[in-house]
Amino acid sequence: ASEPRLEWDGHHWIQKALVFFNNEPIQNLISVGMPEYPHLGGYIWAFFWKNSLLQYEYFGRLFYIYFYITSIFTVFNIAKFKSEKLIYLVVFSLIVITYDKFLFGGYQEYLIFSTLLIASRFITVINFNKNIEYSKIFLILFIMSSMMWFKDEGMFYFLIFGGLLIFLQKSTIIEKIEPLFIMFLTIYTQYYLQKNIIGIYEFNAEFFGQEFIKQISDFRFILLKVIAITKHFIIAFIKYPLWIIVIFSLLFVKNISIKESSFLKYCFYAFILNILFVYAVYINDPLDYEFLLSVTIDRVLFQTSSFYLYIFILILNKNKAISSNL
């Protein structure tokens, strides 16, 4: 069998996979390229690579595809269509517009994409207007926390999506303390394990460093950055049209119940914070921002687009003409 191509980031991530594949001590992760990157994706890669019959490297990456397809099929559980043909059509269409062979070349974006899609499926059963449902909240937080072990930005997504989930519950501050404590304890646990077992915990870029302080005082430079980021946002939305579907869904959803309205409000706030986070990341980065935007922002945006997919399914569920005629 010919080996599917490893792309640029894949050559960094495979080094982590090789540490696990060769049964090396986990501390050896500090000596590979980009040691500050989280390693769970590399462990999964190595596990399925080592336990495959032929032990081809790309067999480990096949799990990423399996995880992705499985997450897409969670649509079945919430779609209230009378016609199975429509369900299959929707699932097939989602795969067509979200499948990117390039990202299966060793990139970790699909792990974030699939994790958020599965988490959002569980969030649809949360009733924000009742007392906090601890068991459901803890399950969702557990699912979301895995993102921290896939990519650096996973921690910030965990804070955005998990924090909002707790904050918007119709409960007292006292009742929200426990899940908030669990969330921050989970973040601290990841920090502690990486710092004290692997030996390193840091991000790929410095936050609000001296270079950023210099730039922030230059209004014209910041404006040029914002314009460039916005331009590449539009390019990314065209490249991954699921975002276009998400935005139109947010704009045109109507005739929804109180429970659905709360879910929609949660998604809207998450969307705003999600977008602001991306702007903040690229405004903060001191590197050649035009080049950086051209090679990264599409992937950064793609990995969170799945979270808002259920708004589109909600619209289809409400459209009886569509759901009953196919």
Language-model segment annotations:
Residues 79-87, 129-135, 169-178, 251-272, ...:
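Membrane-interface helix-loop-helix junctions at transmembrane boundaries of multi-pass membrane enzymes
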Residues 111-129, 143, 307:
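Specific aromatic-rich, kink-prone transmembrane helix
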Residues 68-80, 166, 238-268, 310-312, ...:
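Hydrophobic, aromatic-rich transmembrane alpha-helices
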Residues 2, 167-170, 175-255, 271-279:
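Membrane-lumen/periplasm interface segments of specific transmembrane helices
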Residues 2-16, 22-44, 55:
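Extracytoplasmic catalytic/substrate-binding loops of multi-pass membrane glycan-assembly enzymes
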Residues 73-97:
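Transmembrane-helix signature of polytopic, membrane-embedded enzymes
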